[in-house]
Amino acid sequence: MDGRPVRLLSGALHYFRVHEGHWDHRLAMLRAMGLNCVETYVPWNLHEPRPGVFRELAVLGRFLDAVGRAGLLAIVRPGPYICAEWENGGLPHWVTGPLGRRVRTRDPEYLRAVDGWLAAVLPQVVPRQCDRGGPVIMVQVENEYGSYGSDAGYLAHLAGRLRALGVTVPLFTSDGPEDHMLTGGSVPGLTATVNFGSGAREAFATLRRHRPDGPLMCMEFWCGWFSHWHTGPGGEDAEVMEATEAGQAGETAEAGAVAKAGEAGEVGEVGEGGVRDAADAAAALAEILECGASVNIYMAHGGTSFGGWAGANRAGALQDGALLPTVTSYDYDAPVDERGRPTAKFWRFREVLAPYAEGPVPAPPAPQPVLAAAAEVRLTGWASMDAVLDGLGGPEVWSGAPPTFEELDVDRGVVRYRLSVPGPRAPYELRVRGVRDRAVTFVDGAPGPVLDTEEAVLGPVAGPAEVELWVESLGRVNYGPRLGEAKGITGGVLHERQYLHGVRARGLRLDAVEDATAVARLVFEEPRPGARGLHRGTVVVPAGGVGDAVLELPGWTRGFVWVGGFPLGRYWSAGPQRSLYVPGPCLREGANEVLVLELEGAAPGTSGPGRPSANRPGTDGSGTNGPGTDGSGTNGPGTDGPSVEAPRLVP
């Protein structure tokens, strides 16, 4: 840089996972750890929700300007695919829906969409390159492509488009340090980097077999890990979780690098999940630097997957097993936690990085304000799911077979499927094929069980009957061969062996709840805490009391929350995440509107899931609620657990 060698001491911080009001503080925290650079992905699906409709692209430019003001360099990874534990790996549903396996190849239809994306986003990057006085020092081509494909022509096309659109700083690729990954993911003439969490000498030796010359860099030094719903140390899905991590991280024999010691404590809002010992991580970081390499700490500050944008993985070494949806918190056991606080890992890393820094490492900035006192949300109204769908949903579509989310233009949200069982006919099981991912059911208006496996069974059901299935996406897969798979009912509904045709489907996109005018037109009834539907309320923050907080929802089951119009993300009583992070800039003194979209429902006197699962203990296999329920679709009186309470903000 300017004719002199530069060792990049970088940390990952995704601008879209941090409230803009916190950027300056988080960037200052990275500098105080001893870093001189920040890396960010750019999620295509966040910025182009529909073909040719772009939103908030300027936020990337503002972030890069903040990086420059902080005295940091920037690495930009614009996709089109980003992984990042992000919905669909950053690919828009309107791309993967019609194209399927043709994505991430030189397919002409896919490349037209990609070229449009790059042409739209790069004007935020090109003027901010370091050779023009800005902070951007490197730009990535695709992302870990060697873990997915082998289309060298596709990678060459992307590199050519980046250059044609004005990128003059070095281009690079990043892959696992395995021969087949570097062979599939590298581009001749471009810098190749590797991603791993330990074993730097072995990883760089592999890279040197492919690139005898050039800089060494670990583009993703995995200092922690992420968590999935329904998982945790010692939990029923712990082995599945570890197998998934071994598959993804195990591109470099990474299975043992992420500890599951349950020592997260107060790290982020997860409390349990993948954590890594600070001393172990610091030693691995030191080994990278001792090799003379540059590094990007993934994550330096993880933040939060606001707005229901968290992705999912598939279990197994080849990521082709059961769905494992990722929690809302992206704390990642990073050195700077979800709330921007330094952890033990921060101080360990600072000690390792300080000798390599150019000049003294600055002190950390002052902590961000914290909510002065707990405050309860006063619920003022409730609208049923049918009312919400009528007011905020898309048009109802008739189809011979169930349309997918993609066909209904639903990225995140739910779809209501209605179908008729002809009659008279004997009671047979209803087999729902390809459920992705979770369905709340009704038969002739009576609640049935929740379907939570891809090949699910409901019934027996006699005809004639009317059936409703409210299917929710728990997050599209962001890594592996199941990338881009459709959501909804993807394989049809059968009564005995007969397909039921003539399906009426209507979708509700999550972002529809962010339309304040449309929400204001809904007819709200008296509050019904914990019931399925949209709950409206207010929380009052006293003068001088605004600051970071967490939102607790005791007894609620699963859904999404908005505070002051800001989408916090998904909550789920399944755990391990028990509360949602509320950035202080979302709040204001006085009354703040709160919206809670509860998708499953829990009855007063319960705290767990409001209905039995069709595939778990607690149902009698009849297609209706089994013993211990009152038939209302929620647990009946007398069940154990604390009652449903009003949501509350806690410092």
Predicted regions, residues:
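Aromatic-lined substrate-binding rim segments of carbohydrate-active enzymes
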Residues: 23-87, 159-164
